[in-house]
Amino acid sequence: MTRNAPPGQESTDLAWLVTPAKDLVENFSIDVLKALAGYLEVIRQESEDTDNQVDAATTYRLFDFQRACRIIQGSCAVYGRKVDHVYELTISVVDLVENKGQDDGNTGSRRGAGRRKNFNLGSTNYDLADIDSLKQEALANFEKTVKEEKKSIDAVRMVENAEVIESQYERKSCLVAKPTQFMFKLNYGQLNRTDEQILNAKSRPDVIGKVKDFEIKKSKVKHDQQILYSHDCYRGNLDQFTLPGARWMPDNKELAANFGVADLEVELDLEQEHEKISAYGPFKDPLSGREVVPPPRWFIEQEAVRQNQEIQSRATSRAITIAAKTLRDSQGFGSQPTRLSQPFVERHRQSNHLNDFLSFVEGRVNKNRPSTHLTTGLVDMFVDNFGSVMQNDEPNTSRRPDENYAPMDFDDDFGGGGDDDDDDYIRNLSRRDEKRAPAPWDELDKNHIIWYTGDENLPVVSKPVKKITKFQPKPAEMLARKQRREEKINKSRRDEFMETHDYLQDYYYWRSAARINPIKDWKIESLRTAILAEKKRRIKEKTAKIREARIQNMQRKRTARVIPVEQFEPVTEDIPTSNRRTLGAEYDDVVDEDLAAEVELSMFGGGFDDDEEDVRPRGERPPMAPNNLEFDALQTDFDIPPAEYVPLRFEDIDDAELNSVINLPGNLLIDKALPLLKKFAENRTDREQMAYEMAKAYEDVDVAVSTLQEHVDKWHSRMEPILEEGETRKEYDVHAVGRAVIGQYDIEGGTKRLLDLVMDRPWYEISRYFLSCLFMCNVGNVMVSEDMELPLEERINSMKITLLKRDMHCEMFKEAGALDA
């Protein structure tokens, strides 16, 4: 600011210069850069014209627009902040230039459209704010703010969790209103329609229970409304399980009582065992005898919270005032389309009125099920008692509403909402599928991204990264670890043999199918053909018995002319009667479908014993005399003795059949198995022989252990000392062995035989010395020579090593630090 106020002419000139800036008050959408560029050009031009005329002491410096324009053009990130600051400073300058000295009272008298707007900009300090200091202060308080936010979030969560837990563990007592037509008739005390099914509201309805699933406890019947009020929890009203739609929040006592454990039994168990019985089961249902496992606690809590939210959503979406609806009676008469009411209604009791209704069976009820509809009573009661009051708010009614009556909210699901397709109920339920908005405390947990302009001087801390290197263990150590793990496992001799046997079958003989399909076992395959042959023989024998019995019991039409049995039987055998149920499909051994079912059942051993006769023929009825035309009494049946049953013996099986079915992995087991089968098959049946062979194969160690096990044991005894001795050897270092070889020479240029160098050395170090000599020969430390005239097998004995120099390359590299780099 200047020391003296400018004169009037100069004030007018300055006001003309800042006219575009004054327009920012009315229209901020102008091009600020273009306007500031115009300011800069005008100031430059006037400064050049008046530079030599105006004294420096009388120069009025209001604002450096050139500096402001450069700041805006140089920093695009802070463009908006700078423009706002320039705008505020410009407006304050205009107010000071035009309004200064007019505070003598004349300003207050100027009213109307010509009055200038006053801007309260606060302080007239035009110094730019120190952004760096503000940022440093904000960064210093950032951690403190974050901690306070976390504490507040934790406090909110604790309060909410406490409220949720308190609501969960609160003993809920719900009032259920049930139509009396499902319970008791008024004229006689007998259950009515107890087997009617209750369906849910899916597109394909599922049965969720029957009427008889409900028990009435602590109930009161109101005959005028035909509704039964039950002041009890849902679990007391349900017989065994909670049906879908019921809102039940159990505690430990209810869990123990509702899943088959009575309170008396709990007390007796507590007195005897002095321990608390878990309320989460499993328990045994005393009615059905089956084991009932209740859901886990976390599932019960989750379902309780979800059901509570669902109740609120349903109550909000379905609470529609009656002003826009028309209630119809229970018989379906009225202007609205036909809409049947729902079978069950649950409600909360407030004062003595039915204020709201929630459907017990969730979803829309199928209207084609008249067995579960309220035919009389409930809706008529609503129309008679509340219909006229609820219609007071309609615009066309002249009756004044009751002042002492509050309009109620209820489920207007009876009229259908005026839609022809009657889908208003489903449309209102669509709100349950909407996604809930996230809670405010969930948003606070997210890490918000802080935007920086690039001008901040943020402290940067760099920490060294710890490099973790994991080396591969040595082969000897890996082998030792494996042996230590295997030593801890206690295995029997048979398990070790089977592991070796499976390994050879999979990797040596390529017989992995034996492990994939355990059914293909030699113990079963060896008896498969014999078992099938015996089954076929029994089927044929039983089929013959059944046919014989049916022929004997065949009822013949008694006429004046009776055909003798000797003439009738050959005809029936040549032309069998086809079965109408098989539609012409004949069986090989069986003619009738019932006979085929019996034979098939006998093949699987279903309900038939070997030593029991399945069919006992009643005997043949001889024909009556030709001269007797009347029906006489039936003659006494006579029994035919059953045929003797001969069980299958393995001695009947020939050697060729046994050799064709037995497939064993070795000749030794075949040689042992065949005599064994013949030896014990003389006095045993097929089942006894199968049981003996199965037990023998698993229990007799002498049969299971073969020459393969002996070879494996010998191989183990020979290889284990070698492997153990190999683990005790030192690691091979080519440079260390090379130094030992050079150390045996006294002077450079000396020559020694390889046999002299390895004298008194272990046998495994001979190859190490030889490889070290070859390595030093490549780097120029020694020279290897041999007698070329000798044969190839004897040249190794004549090999000579000559020392050329003692300095090794590895030591030179180590001194220079090349190996470490």
From Swiss-Prot:
<dbReference type="Pfam" id="PF16858">
    <property type="entry name" value="CNDH2_C"/>
</dbReference>
<dbReference type="InterPro" id="IPR031737">
    <property type="entry name" value="CNDH2_C"/>
</dbReference>
<keyword id="KW-0137">Centromere</keyword>
<dbReference type="GO" id="GO:0005634">
    <property type="term" value="C:nucleus"/>
</dbReference>
<keyword id="KW-0498">Mitosis</keyword>
<dbReference type="InterPro" id="IPR031739">
    <property type="entry name" value="Ncaph2"/>
</dbReference>
<dbReference type="GO" id="GO:0000070">
    <property type="term" value="P:mitotic sister chromatid segregation"/>
</dbReference>
<keyword id="KW-0131">Cell cycle</keyword>
<dbReference type="GO" id="GO:0003682">
    <property type="term" value="F:chromatin binding"/>
</dbReference>
<dbReference type="GO" id="GO:0051306">
    <property type="term" value="P:mitotic sister chromatid separation"/>
</dbReference>
<feature type="region of interest" description="Disordered">
    <location>
        <begin position="389"/>
        <end position="426"/>
    </location>
</feature>
<keyword id="KW-0175">Coiled coil</keyword>
<dbReference type="GO" id="GO:0000775">
    <property type="term" value="C:chromosome, centromeric region"/>
</dbReference>
<keyword id="KW-0469">Meiosis</keyword>
<keyword id="KW-0158">Chromosome</keyword>
<comment type="subunit">
    <text>Component of the condensin II complex, which contains the mix-1/SMC2 and smc-4/SMC4 heterodimer, and three non SMC subunits, capg-2, kle-2 and hcp-6 that probably regulate the complex. Within the complex, interacts with mix-1, smc-4, capg-2 and hcp-6.</text>
</comment>
<dbReference type="Pfam" id="PF06278">
    <property type="entry name" value="CNDH2_N"/>
</dbReference>
<dbReference type="InterPro" id="IPR009378">
    <property type="entry name" value="H2_N"/>
</dbReference>
<keyword id="KW-0539">Nucleus</keyword>
<comment type="similarity">
    <text>Belongs to the CND2 H2 (condensin-2 subunit 2) family.</text>
</comment>
<keyword id="KW-0132">Cell division</keyword>
<protein>
    <recommendedName>
        <fullName>Condensin-2 complex subunit kle-2</fullName>
    </recommendedName>
</protein>
<dbReference type="GO" id="GO:0010032">
    <property type="term" value="P:meiotic chromosome condensation"/>
</dbReference>
<feature type="compositionally biased region" description="Acidic residues">
    <location>
        <begin position="409"/>
        <end position="424"/>
    </location>
</feature>
<dbReference type="GO" id="GO:0051301">
    <property type="term" value="P:cell division"/>
</dbReference>
<dbReference type="GO" id="GO:0045132">
    <property type="term" value="P:meiotic chromosome segregation"/>
</dbReference>
<feature type="coiled-coil region">
    <location>
        <begin position="529"/>
        <end position="561"/>
    </location>
</feature>
<dbReference type="GO" id="GO:0000796">
    <property type="term" value="C:condensin complex"/>
</dbReference>
<comment type="function">
    <text>Regulatory subunit of the condensin II complex, a complex that seems to play a role in prophase chromosome condensation and in chromosome segregation in mitosis and in meiosis.</text>
</comment>
